[in-house]
Amino acid sequence: MIPQAEYLQRAHVLRSAMAARNLDALLCYGSKRGQVRYISGYHPNYIANAAMVVLPKQCDAIMRIRFPFDLERARESSWIPDIAASGNTLNLASDAAAYLVEHQLAHGTIGLVTGDIVVDEMPRGLFQSLADMLPDVTWSEAGDVLQGMRLVKTASELDALRSSAQLADLGAEAAQEAVRPGVTEFEVVACAEAAMRRAGAEGYLVVISSKGERELIGPPESKSLEKGDNVIIEIAVQREGYWTQVARVFSVGQPTRALRRLYDQTYRAFRLALTDARPGRTCSELARSIGASLENAGLADAIEQDFGHGIGLDLPESPRIEHKDHTVIQEGMVLVIHPAVRKIGVGGVFIGGTALVQANQAELIHEIPDSL
């Protein structure tokens, strides 16, 4: 649980950043992603729900949500004193505009936070409505302010992440127990999801593949597992708002010697990455280190996707562990590191998990076996 004092500290830091940028207020909009929750403590949490927070440099903040039936939960979740329901998305804009006019901010510079590295959640029509209602406002993109704050996690955030990781491991264990001939991919995923939900999962995402060399991960299918299948499962789970992610490999029956070797080579690159993910290095350097380990094992042509990303209130978050991301790794960052390879004639291996960057290396907070 994130204490109220921490939300108040976030607001203080945001106001300092606003002053440095000559912003008169910050307007934050969101529905599914974590920007509103990071500031307010409230997550809209429903498919068509949304919320808007206005945080002035000096006056009290307000929050407007779309659905009236969620008002009680919003007020219980948030430190913001003035919370009301607007009824529809357009009214979110008109309520925010009225507040800015009332507080003599309709001629100021307003910072916009409407998404992250994955998606901008504010519909174009909603922004146009705001712009029409506030023709004298200067709008300034301010998403990077929040992104920078969210890179390094606090002690209470790390506690939530460790709790989330326990659920992810619970789901992986349930999946492993379910993997046997005749069981479908749907059934394996259902076992993982049920175990996590029973233990308090707020949200989850489970993908699976028993195709090995042909497909690394994908949505579950009605395909029944057969002896010799190479099963890859990736589990992400949210608890107390915070996501963790783990990727595991299972074999239906005894794995082949070649698949064991592929697992060992990928696991070696993964453990090396945990050692190399230390303060002062960049994400691009970490990506090169993982890539070099796999290439030295003769797997240059087998490498799949990037090597990981940040995680927290959102899945994924900044930064990305790839060659073009030069973000400097800092103590307190949380990274999902997941090298993946797919080799025709052998199978696929996807190993990874959530790790906390400490003074000298990253600490893995999942249980991942060192052999297949």
Label every PLM stretch briefly.
Residues 1-372:
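Active-site neighborhoods and metal-handling regions in enzymes and metal-associated proteins
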